[in-house]
Amino acid sequence: MNSPDIALIKTYLLTLQDNICGALAQADGHAEFTEECWVREEGGGGRSRVLVNGAVFEQAGVNFSHVSGAMLPASATAHRPELAGRSFQALGVSLVIHPLNPYLPTSHANVRFFIAEKPGEDAVWWFGGGFDLTPYYGFEEDAIHWHQVAHSLCQPFGEQIYPRYKKWCDDYFYIKHRQEARGIGGLFFDDLNSPDFMTCFNFTQAVGDGFLAAYMPIVARRKALGWGDRERQFQLYRRGRYVEFNLVWDRGTLFGLQTGGRTESILMSLPPLVRWEYNYQPEADSAEAALYRDFLPVKDWLAIKGETH
């Protein structure tokens, strides 16, 4: 099977949104997701869910969208001029979780499908997605676990998949104007359309399903750790990097805004509170300095555990 089954993809994505929201609400134990279904005037719509002011999660947004249009925006055709003049559909689930506890990392995941069609010509389609982790106070055990899950889900699809998509993630989530990684990475892939539709779809499902396996054990380990104003202020400062990346560099944000997407859903990735501080430098040998020294530089986390891959 090499012709895309959009109904199959949509069913999976809606189920994935349900599963992730259910797991997050259960872990929070205090707040529930509110849902808003929306329609896009130019075509399509979506289902946005957000949890706010929880006991564990200050804000968690999990968005499903299925949008369509008669013509692609500049952000899409700039890199792929062959798509000009084609109608398109884009389906995806995207989520960003901003915990309250500074010892809990922010996490992001996204799985998506894109197809551009023109009468009389073959459709152009691909999958993309991934997940990445942004700690404020890093724990080696958590970083290894995160990457071990990523490695394991890639293995059935080939030995080369994890290192390739890990590097892509490290390269993509890099804040160029800060010369600094956004976090400790994970997986990132795009333009996936070979060897065939079902293989690509199966891999995309593995990534989507892998998110909870990667993130929820970290939530369970860290959500009860005590914290104070110092940790909170550092968390708010580091959230600024998240905002900078999403508004300046993230292709998905730019695509959404340029296609007339729903602004509230697109900017749901931004943290509810954030601060900037001129020329901040962490104290030498502090827990804050350890983030810059031990976690933000790119490294092979599986090698620490002595794994081969």
Swiss-Prot record:
Cofactor: a divalent metal cation
Self-association state and partner proteins as the record states: Homodimer.
Domain of life the protein comes from: Bacteria
Record-linked Pfam families: Coprogen_oxidas
Pathway: Porphyrin-containing compound metabolism; protoporphyrin-IX biosynthesis; protoporphyrinogen-IX from coproporphyrinogen-III (O2 route): step 1/1
Residue numbers annotated as active site: H108
EC number: 1.3.3.3
Described purpose of this protein according to its UniProt entry: Involved in the heme biosynthesis. Catalyzes the aerobic oxidative decarboxylation of propionate groups of rings A and B of coproporphyrinogen-III to yield the vinyl groups in protoporphyrinogen-IX.
Any single GO CC term annotated in Swiss-Prot or TrEMBL for this entry: cytoplasm
Single Gene Ontology BP annotation: protoporphyrinogen IX biosynthetic process
Residue sites binding a divalent metal cation per the record: H98, H108, H147, H177
Site entry: Important for dimerization: H177
Protein name in the entry: Oxygen-dependent coproporphyrinogen-III oxidase
Keywords linked to the UniProt accession: Cytoplasm, Heme biosynthesis, Metal-binding, Oxidoreductase, Porphyrin biosynthesis
NCBIfam families xref list: PRK05330.1
GO molecular function: coproporphyrinogen oxidase activity; metal ion binding; protein homodimerization activity
Binding site for substrate: S94, N110, V111, R112, G260, G261, R262
UniProt organism field: Yersinia pseudotuberculosis serotype O:1b (strain IP 31758)
Gene for this chain: hemF
